[in-house]
Amino acid sequence: MTGSAEETFEVARQLGESLSGGEVLALVGDLGSGKTTFTRGLVCGAGCADYARVNSPTYVLEQVYQGRVPIRHYDAYRLGSPCELDELGFQEALSSRAVLVVEWADRVESLLPADRLLLELSFAGVEREGEGPGDGRLLRFSSSSAAWAARLASLGGACADNEQG
């Protein structure tokens, strides 16, 4: 769990530092739950100096960020079918060195590889002493991959509550 957008960013930044290329991250959550904030942190951790320009590619459907490893950021919110993502070259991107981040991944699940990290983001309603309701988020990581489980365990903190299987 994170208590603010800054903490969500930091968890993602740490995860981004561990990326080596070719990974797929599937992000799921309501509007405003932090998917784009998480992606911004991930892009920062992957070494993109221009991470502050990361925004949701809802209308353009895909953004590409260059850093230590390239990141292809997709948004499936407006797609009518998974085929539309495939028309953007998603299958080709899967065989590239790029890290693929898909917001609203539940809408294109049939295109995603089994070896992916699923992140479900939800509102936590965290209250901090003297501050009232906060900007908290629950981050629920899951993957069938032992490699993802080990990576998340090494990060500790908000990533500690992950599931494998």
Please name every model-derived segment.
Residues K35:
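Conserved lysine of the Walker
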Residues S56-H73:
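AAA+/P-loop NTPase substrate/partner-engagement loops
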Residues G16-G22:
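Phosphate-binding P-loop
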Residues C44-R53:
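Post-Walker A helix-loop "phosphate-sensing" segment adjacent to the P-loop in P-loop NTPases
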Residues V24-A26:
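Short hydrophobic/aromatic beta-strand immediately N-terminal to the Walker A/P-loop
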Residues M1-Q14:
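N-terminal pre-Walker A segment at the start of P-loop NTPase domains
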Residues L85-G165:
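Short phosphate-coordinating micro-motif centered on Lys-Gly-acidic
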Residues V28-D30:
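P-loop (Walker A) phosphate-binding loop of NTP-binding proteins
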